[in-house]
């Protein structure tokens, strides 16, 4: 007798052709996908596919929430209002007309472009505090651009310095955020370690950076002067 063949109805294995992500927007399918992620039955490709589908499904709601929180922060957040005032004094203008909430396809929180303004990745915002940190981060970029005429494209030292500044001043390296969200459990020199680590990651992502060692070297070259610079604040605010 021929050897028995596996049943066509048996549970499929995760492979290059089956990444473990089930298509569908219904609640049952979504919970099955979440369970597959939690139990390790979904590949990295499948997890990304699940996240993209979720982001597309929630795009309108994510952008609306982001815009509402953006407008609230522009009106009521002390750090955002302070940065807005200092940017305005340098001849710039950042407000709801050029701070955009959009769905992003790459995993980042936001970005700054001198010609267009600030992008906030609505699908990556965890809560209003995260959005406030991201806005402050990018507004420090805008302040640096107006005050120091930063060469974003070619000068890695300029890029490294502004990354150190904005990461240190925006609040994203607060102890609680590092401890509870990122699993960084240092009690001494935590702020400095966080700023340097995240600045190196940002510089590493730039096209003119060769590798991580190159990024680390550039950040170390500008570290002493740039970490001490707290403009437009008198001291590290958050």
From Swiss-Prot:
GO terms for molecular function: metal ion binding; metalloendopeptidase activity. It is found in: Mitochondrion inner membrane. It holds the Pfam family Peptidase_M76. One of its GO terms (biological process) is mitochondrial proton-transporting ATP synthase complex assembly. InterPro entries: Peptidase_M76_ATP23. A divalent metal cation binds at residues 137, 141. It is an enzyme of class 3 (hydrolase). GO terms for cellular component: mitochondrial inner membrane. It is a peripheral membrane protein. The keyword Metal-binding applies. Has a dual role in the assembly of mitochondrial ATPase. Acts as a protease that removes N-terminal residues of mitochondrial ATPase CF(0) subunit 6 at the intermembrane space side. Also involved in the correct assembly of the membrane-embedded ATPase CF(0) particle, probably mediating association of subunit 6 with the subunit 9 ring. This is Mitochondrial inner membrane protease atp23.
């Amino acid at each position: 007798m021929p050897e028995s063949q596996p049943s066509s109805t048996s549970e499929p294995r995760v492979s290059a052709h089956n990444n473990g992500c089930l298509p569908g927007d219904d609640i049952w399918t979504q919970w099955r996908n979440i369970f597959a992620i939690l139990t390790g039955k979904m590949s990295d490709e499948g997890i990304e596919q699940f996240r993209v589908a979720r982001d597309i499904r929630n795009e309108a709601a994510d952008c609306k929430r982001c815009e509402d929180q953006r407008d609230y922060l522009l009106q009521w957040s002390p750090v955002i209002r302070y940065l807005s005032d200092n940017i305005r004094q340098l001849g710039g203008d950042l407000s709801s007309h050029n701070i955009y909430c959009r769905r992003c396809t790459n995993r980042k929180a936001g970005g700054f472009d001198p010609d267009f303004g600030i992008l906030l990745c609505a699908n990556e915002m965890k809560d209003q505090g995260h959005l406030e940190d991201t806005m402050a981060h990018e507004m420090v970029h805008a302040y640096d651009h107006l005050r120091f005429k930063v060469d974003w494209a070619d000068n890695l030292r300029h890029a490294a310095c502004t990354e150190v500044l904005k990461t240190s001043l925006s609040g994203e390296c607060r102890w609680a955020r590092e401890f509870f969200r990122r699993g960084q459990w240092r009690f001494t020199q935590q702020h400095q370690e966080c700023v340097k680590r995240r600045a190196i990651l940002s510089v590493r992502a730039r096209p003119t950076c060769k590798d991580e060692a190159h990024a680390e070297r550039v950040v170390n070259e500008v570290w002493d002067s740039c970490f001490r610079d707290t403009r437009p604040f008198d001291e590290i605010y958050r």
